[in-house]
Every structure is written in structure tokens, then in C-alpha cells.
Regions:
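Conserved N-terminal helical subregion
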Residues: 14-22, 30-33
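Short, surface-exposed charged micro-motifs
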Residues: 26, 35, 60, 116-118, ...
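Core beta-strand elements of the Rossmann-like FAD/NAD(P) dinucleotide-binding domain
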Residues: 52-63, 67
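Short, hydrophobic/aromatic-rich segments at coil-to-beta transitions
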Residues: 42-46, 103-104
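Active-site-adjacent segment of FAD-dependent monooxygenases/related oxidoreductases
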Residues: 1-7
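C-terminal catalytic lobe of FAD-dependent flavoproteins
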Residues: 9-11, 15, 19, 74-78, ...
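A conserved short coil-to-beta-strand element within the FAD-binding core of flavoproteins
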Residues: 29-44
Length: 253
């Protein structure tokens, strides 16, 4: 069921960071890699923007993994100019739950392009999504839904649920995200691009991109194992360790 893949993404990210710190890692918030440290053509670390200075903070590392999503090509361009990422935008609408009080995930095909559109409950509201189109805007500007996407999602909902028709005045809010899809020369239709993840190694820089949040552990495992040749004392990584769910109710979380 689709409901098995529903997750609070912000909590998931924080949990992963907490697990990393507990294992001896260091998390540096509000930091941005401005350039790669190169020695004899090989990546040996990164330079972080220093909010309190102009020189930047130089960090050396045995292995550097570029897991920057839709921005992956921007960093990778310093060692390989080949473009691999096709940024695709997915947008959602949020409406009051009483207008469509679903208790599980419902899916249907859009009447125009036969793409899957989902309606599901979330935090006391109902969400309608998603779209799938090339995101040609500046990646440094937060992505947002456009008018055509709003019409697209409203049409899908109203065709599927003629007894619960809605309009723009019913929309509480919306959000949009940019998918780091691996581009191909064979597909012009965004929805026909493969959603697999891929890992590349360029002059010591490991880049991982693509995939879906539901397979984030496998994606991380493949990226870590790709870095093994640069970590001579490390053992092959495994996916045996799992998160231990806290003994709390949903309200206590």
C-alpha cells in the first residue's frame, strides 16, 4: 500500500543526522561547499563558505561524497563538465480534510496524460499530487507551483471525485520539490525518465543522485561502498543496522 511509504521527511532527516552524530560524525549546519580541494587532479577535500570570514574553511577528507540532489552537477562540474541531472518539479495542493476526508491513499490516472495522481491524508488535511515537469528555473530560488500545475491537479481531482469538486478558493497551501532525476537522451517526456539512482566516481569525487526517498538506505549503501577504495581501513558497509523505533505514541512524537 502507498501508505506504507508515507513519512515525515523533516523528522527522517533529523533522525539520520542524530544517528550519524551518535556514531561519531559531525553535522555542520548552514554550510555550503564553494569548491573542491584538488591536488594533482584528485579531490582531497572541500572548501566551505565561512559566514564570519572571506577565506573559507578548508576541510580535508579521505573521501568526498557529493549527495546534493538536483544541485549535484554544479559541484561535479569542477571535475567533470558532463551534465547528468534532469531537474523535474513535483507540486502538491493542500485542501481542508472535510472537503475530502480520505483515510488512506487513493490513486487515479489523470484524464489528459494518464499519469498517476494521488490523494492522501496528511496532518489533518488532504494532499493532492503530484505533477512532473522540467524545472527550468534557477535552482537557488525555492521551487513553487505554477498556475498550469494548479489547474492540472484540480482537474484530476474533480474528474475523479465529481461529488466533491473543489476550486482555487479551497486551497490552503501548496508546495513543490525538485527531483534529481538521471537524464537520458532517449526520453523527452519527464514521466518516462527512469527513477533509478546512480553513482559516479570522478577524480576521487563520489557523486550519487536519482532514486526515491523510499530507497534512501540502499542509495546511501551504494555510495558508501563506492568510496571504499579511498578508505583503505574500512570494511564493506552493510544494511543490517536498522532504526530502532521509539516506544512512543503518535501524539507523543
Amino acid at each position: 500500500a502507498y501508505s506504507y511509504a508515507m513519512v515525515d521527511d523533516s523528522r527522517l532527516v533529523l533522525r539520520v543526522l542524530q544517528e550519524s552524530i551518535s556514531a561519531g560524525g559531525t553535522a555542520i549546519n548552514y554550510s555550503k561547499v564553494s569548491e573542491l580541494l584538488l591536488e594533482e587532479g584528485q579531490v582531497q577535500g572541500v572548501v566551505l563558505n565561512d559566514p564570519e570570514g572571506s577565506d573559507g574553511i578548508r576541510l580535508r577528507a579521505a573521501a568526498v561524497i557529493n549527495a546534493t540532489g538536483a544541485w549535484a552537477d554544479r559541484l561535479r562540474n569542477q571535475v567533470n563538465p558532463e551534465k547528468r541531472i534532469r531537474p523535474l518539479r513535483g507540486s502538491h495542493l493542500i485542501i481542508p480534510r472535510n472537503l475530502m476526508p480520505v483515510t488512506d491513499v487513493l490513486t487515479s490516472l489523470h484524464p489528459d496524460d494518464k499519469r498517476g495522481v494521488y490523494v492522501y491524508p496528511w496532518e489533518g488535511t488532504t494532499v493532492i499530487g503530484t505533477t512532473d515537469l522540467d524545472h527550468d528555473e534557477d535552482l537557488d530560488i525555492e521551487a513553487s507551483i505554477n498556475n498550469a500545475e494548479v489547474d492540472y491537479l484540480l482537474q484530476a481531482f474533480n474528474v475523479q471525485f465529481p461529488g466533491h469538486t473543489i476550486s482555487r478558493v479551497d486551497i490552503i497551501s501548496s508546495w513543490a520539490g525538485v527531483r534529481p532525476v538521471i537524464g537520458s537522451e532517449s526520453s523527452k517526456d519527464p514521466s518516462k525518465e527512469r527513477r533509478d539512482h546512480a553513482v559516479w566516481s570522478d577524480n576521487g569525487l563520489i557523486t550519487v543522485s536519482g532514486g526515491k526517498l523510499t530507497t534512501f538506505r540502499l542509495i546511501a549503501l551504494d555510495a558508501l561502498n563506492a568510496a571504499l577504495p579511498q578508505l583503505p581501513n574500512a570494511k564493506p558497509f552493510s544494511d543490517e543496522r536498522v532504526f530502532i523505533a521509539p516506544d512512543l505514541t503518535a501524539k507523543e512524537l
